[in-house]
Amino acid sequence: MAANSTPEGPLPVGEVSRLIGGWIDRLGAVWVEGQITQLSRRPGAGVVFLTLRDPSYDISVSVTCYRQVFDAVADVVGEGARVVVHAKPEWYAPRGQLSLRAAEIKPVGVGELLARLEQLKKALAREGLFAAERKQPLPFLPQLIGLVCGRASAAERDVLENARHRWPAVRFEVRNVPVQGVHAVPQVVQAVKELDARDDVDVIVVARGGGSVEDLLPFSDEQLVRAVAACRTPVVSAIGHEPDSPLLDLVADLRASTPTDAAKKVVPDVGEEYERVRLLRDRARRCVAAFVDREERGLAHALARPSIQDPHRMIEERAEQVTALLDRGRRSLRHHLDRADSELTHTHARVVALSPAATLKRGYAVLQRADGHAVRDPGEVEPGETLRARVSEGDFSVRVDA
């Protein structure tokens, strides 16, 4: 329950420390898992001092135990080992310091570690951190490569030498960090984040030259896995441990079997690229030559056509054809005109011969009554009626006598 206090009636530091100690005492003994980061065994001392650290959250707590408790596991436990401790929390009031008094220490075996890693792997996989669609492609020719590795390590040498042998102009930004032990995870995470924050870094390589399962535990740490998953820069894992791949291999954008393999996958080989360029150049030359040859043959075929070799000949042939057609047209037109003229003359003669004027010229006359009606029958006129007689050269009046 909360202690009663007010601004006017605050609790003294000693009282607060005593209350905290009381709450901690009521907690009782607990099982705690962590990694031993410091170990102090003074000769002749009956107490062993340890520092137990949670690598995922970088939180540590002091642990004390009797020598006989530690001696029971001294052969298999040392700095960097993961252990499970059965301990009672203690509060040292004068310093306001929390510690654990261990009554039993158990090392975490490889089998148990692998089982826990498998559980973590499944949990992270359910979150989609290992999904293929999250993988980023590596740049074809990175200008600056970030390298996270141990100082003066074989992994660093393998990556640098092989990459520069393949592409001498490549540059590196190297971050030397512990790659095993209690300080590995926070420093590797920090190095990855620093390189990822730089705009000029094209790809990040995390390299280590293999090791035991325990040595490679930092590269399966959840904190590191999530840091790599959050990177905007492509990350290559080159831990070099085939049988049991750390979780970093699964979350990285590309897994390399060794640091040397990482160098080969990150940068192209200058000799291979020169050869590829040569082959492409030869192929382009052959394609251009074939194209030019094909076009030359087509041009030669076109030039061989009569219309190209002697263009005037075709025009002259057409001109002769036009002249012949004109002559034929004139002859045909003249023939049609002559025949039409003959027919017209013949028709005109017939018309003239059959016309009333020709009949009158032969001595005939046309009698017309006063209303202009031609007389065809004697019964149409009456005695004494005046008629108009029309002859070839004119007309005159006549009177009907009887």
From Swiss-Prot:
Its EC number is 3.1.11.6. It is an enzyme of class 3 (hydrolase). GO terms for biological process: DNA catabolic process. Transmembrane segments: none annotated. Keywords: Cytoplasm, Exonuclease, Hydrolase, Nuclease. One of its GO terms (molecular function) is nucleic acid binding. It catalyses: Exonucleolytic cleavage in either 5'- to 3'- or 3'- to 5'-direction to yield nucleoside 5'-phosphates. Its main location: cytoplasm. InterPro entries: Exonuc_VII_L, Exonuc_VII_lsu_C, OB-fold_nuc-bd_dom. Bidirectionally degrades single-stranded DNA into large acid-insoluble oligonucleotides, which are then degraded further into small acid-soluble oligonucleotides. PANTHER family: EXODEOXYRIBONUCLEASE 7 LARGE SUBUNIT (PTHR30008:SF0). This is Exodeoxyribonuclease 7 large subunit. It comes from Streptomyces coelicolor (strain ATCC BAA-471 / A3(2) / M145).
